[in-house]
From Swiss-Prot:
InterPro entries: Acyl_CoA_acyltransferase, GNAT_dom, NAT10/TcmA_helicase, P-loop_NTPase, TmcA/NAT10/Kre33, TmcA_N, tRNA_acetyltr_TmcA. It comes from Idiomarina loihiensis (strain ATCC BAA-735 / DSM 15497 / L2-TR). Belongs to the RNA cytidine acetyltransferase family. TmcA subfamily. This is tRNA(Met) cytidine acetyltransferase TmcA. It is found in: Cytoplasm.
Length: 612
């Protein structure tokens, strides 16, 4: 493929009127995204709609707040010689300073001067057959030769602009005569380039594909696989014959790097034969493109490990991310990225700009051996507190007190100062050495010293994580009966009071811990476990009252209703159905003669009111 000429340029401005003046004179081949301006092409939250497109200029209005995910994603749509122009927030912060600092490093001219022209770039028809580079051709040969190996799976990772989709399209065009092939992606637009190379390809939306019966004779291609929930990708690979899975690894739609680690491990354990390939040579712009270098350094998208930082001091430290030297920040953030599938550049923005967020890390001779992302939450003050309990408000940055105040109807939880362990990560080579537990012990001491009243965490539940947190003193308080669409697991809340065992707070926390444990037993063991619960319980009473008043949904009240009917109304016709943890409103609708789920909920509310 002929390399396009011309380095791409960056423009960062803080003067809104000046930026919009430049924006009005933008190229016809451009896109303008803004949450504030009605004449923009789209709001920032719709940035994913433009992945797979190419523009001479991309204009992003971040005046009301930086959107790092949009910047990272749309940077890859700027063609060679083109321009990325960003209106920075009105008030400078650590992230905007970081953007300007690395702009000064990678662009020789001042990045606050007007951008006057766009270098002309080589254009081509979207349907033109492109000559593959040596790197692409090597992978292409491996892909096409595998047509003789019907159960070989290829995983291809690349940063943006490496010709990944073009390669897949040409491989698909070559192989379609020999196989029945289906293409899927998070959105059809994500597979635009691939489908242009093989216009006869059959595209099916991934959620529709999951509903179809499995067929091992149908070959599957997934483009931008990191944009799908990991469980969905795994199910698709088990239902069909996975041939090609490709994803971008530079941090949008979740973190492609996290996908590459987690999915590749799963694939090698599960699928018959797996080959992993990586594309490194940029094709949409020249090598050493300053805009790509700026993006990589600014948002820490580099995959290369940072082995040591300058300060060789060993120990456990809790600091704001903006206080860390660059190499240390890179180590901490890369560890969080690799350990958590759903990570993104916006995470770095939060760490650098939110004053209540901290990084707790353990280091030995300049190497980070464990890291945790901490968030300060609560208290929630009146009158907002009552609106939260009623489900009318969900104040940003207060996940634990808000969730406990609403889903468990515990008003007092909103009065307290919480420290949430949002994420914790340990390098794979150092796991099972108690580094994470040691870090949690230090976090406990630090929280006590800094006048927090509660520690807590929330995550997608699994038996292993349940065991880990309980070993470290945390108790399960709530397990959602809904399955998360990304993890295919229920969301869980665990908590640990920072008080002695003789206080009223400690006693209430013990009751909530017992409630959560009983709920877990019920979800896994069914009706028989209800005999282990108490005949009368204040938590149950609060939840049933909230359900009667239509404050909380059926899902949040189901366990309380199951207990109540089991103990107080054992002979009621609904008892058997409600004591089954898998019962849904759909089942209740069938019980009432096929009524809608909404009507089934209304009927149940009326029945509870009559019995109460």
């Amino acid at each position: 493929m002929a390399e396009r000429s011309g380095y791409r340029q960056l423009q960062l401005l803080q003067d809104a009127s000046l930026w919009r003046e430049y924006c009005e004179a933008r190229s016809e081949s451009s896109i303008y995204l803004s949450n504030l301006q009605t004449h923009a092409d789209a709001v920032l939250s719709r940035y994913r709609d433009y992945l797979g497109h190419e523009f001479e200029q991309v204009w992003i209005d971040c005046h009301d707040g930086l959107h790092a995910d949009a910047i990272a994603a749309l940077c890859g749509t700027v063609t060679a010689g083109g321009l990325l122009s960003i209106l920075l927030p009105a008030e400078s912060n650590a992230m905007s300073h970081r953007m300007e600092r690395f702009a000064a490093k990678h662009f020789a001219e001042s990045n606050i001067k007007p951008y006057s022209s766009v270098n002309k770039t080589e254009t081509r028809s979207a349907n033109e057959t492109l000559q593959l580079t040596n790197e692409q051709n090597s992978i292409f040969n491996a892909l096409t030769q595998s047509t003789a190996k019907p159960y070989e799976t290829h995983i291809i990772t690349a940063e943006r602009g490496r010709g990944k989709s073009t390669l897949l399209g040409q491989a698909l065009a070559q192989a379609k005569e020999h196989r029945s092939i289906i293409v899927t992606a998070p959105r059809k637009a994500n597979a635009k380039v691939l489908l242009q190379q093989a216009p006869e390809a059959h595209f099916v939306a991934w959620d529709k594909l999951l509903e179809q019966p499995g067929n091992s004779e149908v070959t599957l291609i997934i483009d931008e696989a990191a944009g799908l929930p990991l469980w969905a990708t795994e199910q698709l690979c088990q239902k069909f014959n996975p041939w090609l899975l490709a994803t971008t690894v530079a941090g949008y739609e979740g973190c492609g790097r996290g996908f590459a680690v987690h999915f590749t491990d799963w694939a090698r354990k599960t699928l018959p034969q797996v080959s992993v390939h990586q594309l490194t040579q940029p094709l949409r712009w020249p090598a050493n493109d300053p805009l790509e270098q700026w993006l990589t350094e600014t948002f820490l998208l580099n995959e290369q490990p940072v082995t040591q930082f300058g300060n060789r001091e060993s120990g456990t430290f809790i600091k704001h991310a903006s206080e860390l030297e660059e190499a240390l920040l890179q180590q901490c953030f890369q560890l969080l990225l690799s350990a958590h599938y759903q990570s993104s550049p916006n995470d770095l923005n939060l760490l650098l700009t939110e004053p209540g967020h901290k990084l707790a890390y353990q280091s030995t001779n300049g190497e980070v051996t464990a890291v945790a992302w901490l968030m300060s939450e609560g208290p929630i003050l009146s009158p907002l507190k009552e609106e939260v309990r009623q489900g009318q408000r969900r104040p940003k940055g207060n996940l634990l007190p808000q969730a406990i105040g609403y889903f468990l109807q515990q008003d007092w939880a909103m009065d307290l100062h919480w420290l949430r362990v949002a994420r914790i990560a340990v390098p794979a080579a150092k796991r099972r050495r108690k580094a994470a537990s040691e870090l949690l012990a230090e976090i406990y001491r630090w929280a006590l010293d800094n006048n927090y009243q509660m520690l807590g965490t929330s995550f997608a539940w699994s038996p292993g994580l349940d065991n880990f947190w309980k070993k470290n003193g945390y108790a399960l308080w709530r397990l959602s009966s809904r399955i998360d669409s990304v993890s295919a697991r229920p969301a869980a809340i665990y908590a640990l009071p920072l008080t002695n065992e003789f206080t009223e707070l400690y006693r209430v926390c013990q009751l909530l811990g017992q409630w959560g444990q009983n709920q877990l037993q019920w979800l896994s063991g069914g009706k028989e476990t209800l005999q282990l619960t108490e005949e009368r319980n204040k938590i149950r009473t609060s939840l049933i009252q909230a359900y009667r008043s239509k404050t909380i949904p059926f899902d949040a009240a189901h366990f309380a209703l199951a207990q109540w009917f089991y103990w107080q109304h054992s002979n009621h016709p609904l008892t058997e159905l409600l004591c089954n943890s898998s019962t849904t409103l759909k089942h209740l609708g069938e019980y009432w003669g096929g009524v809608s789920q909404r009507q089934a909920n209304e009927n149940l509310c009326k029945e509870v009111c009559l019995l109460h």
